[in-house]
Amino acid sequence: MSAVPGVLAVAGDLVEDVVAHTSEPLRMGSDAAATITRQRGGSAANVAVFAAAVGAPTRFVGCVGPDAAGDGVVAELTAKGVDVRVQRRGSTGTIVVVVDDSGERTMLPDRAACALLGTVDDAWLAGVEILHLPLYGFDTGTTPDALRDMATRVRAAGGRVSIDISSTRLVDVHGPAWVDALVADLLPTWVSANADEVTALGLDGDDWLARHPFATVLARAGARATRVLRHGDPTVTVPVQPVEGARDTTGAGDAFAAGFLSATLRGEPVETAVVAGHALAARVICATGAELA
């Protein structure tokens, strides 16, 4: 595998998002009026698109079905400037996203082919300086083993690994010990998580940081400041600038990761990279769905 630096690779889910915006309360057993759109989705795919949009050389690695939906989402990623490497089997995954008036979203994922990734060719990892892995990819199927293998190979070639905790559901289903073991196995340079995920796992606690001294935790908190935490170092607090016109939080965490990692690839220090993450997230929450305003 080439050790040439410069590529941000993102591996994991590429799905079709079905986004339903409603200003009415959901009524069990009844209906609520909504505006519905379809678009590319998946945390890993979102990070790749956002990173490419700000000029980072970006590659996506994943699995979609040999179907029309798979053709469509691959074509969309390619059109956004992403170097797309996918295996084709099963059926393309779908996520139903319900967005309320406040912009908050509830997601109903069917990962389908996303869980079926197998071992990837060395050429797919050539030139990778940073490999970003949302934890969604470690949920089920053959994909977790493929992602672990990718992380091992990237680190062996001198690259670095980034992970995003992704969802408190994963913590609820698998337990904090599962996440702890995964972090110990992947040896990420950065662990990004929102406030609920930080609380569920105790990522800001001395015990957790001491167990994983190799990792810098990026503890996001929505409109509140992001904390940068690392064992033995003082906490760095980076304020979030106010955002007017927020519509939809879908993809905000993905945009933060893309902005942060793209700035890191450019050689920016961690505080500057966090500011870049905030700025890209602000553009996403002012748009509908996981898109940039």
Annotate each PLM feature.
Residues A51, N194, G253:
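Short, conserved phosphate/pyrophosphate- and ester-handling motifs at nucleotide-, phospho-/glycolipid
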Residues M1-L14, E76-Q87, V99-T235:
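Ribokinase/PfkB-type carbohydrate-kinase core domain
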Residues V61, L108, V238-P239:
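Hydrophobic residues at beta-strand termini and immediately following loops
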Residues A44-A48, G70, L147, I163, ...:
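A general structural signal for well-ordered alpha-helical segments in protein cores
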Residues M1-A9, A32, R153, L203-A293:
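Conserved phosphate-binding/catalytic region of the ribokinase-like
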Residues M1-C63, A68-G72, A246:
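Glycine-rich phosphate/adenosyl-contacting loop at the front of the ribokinase-like
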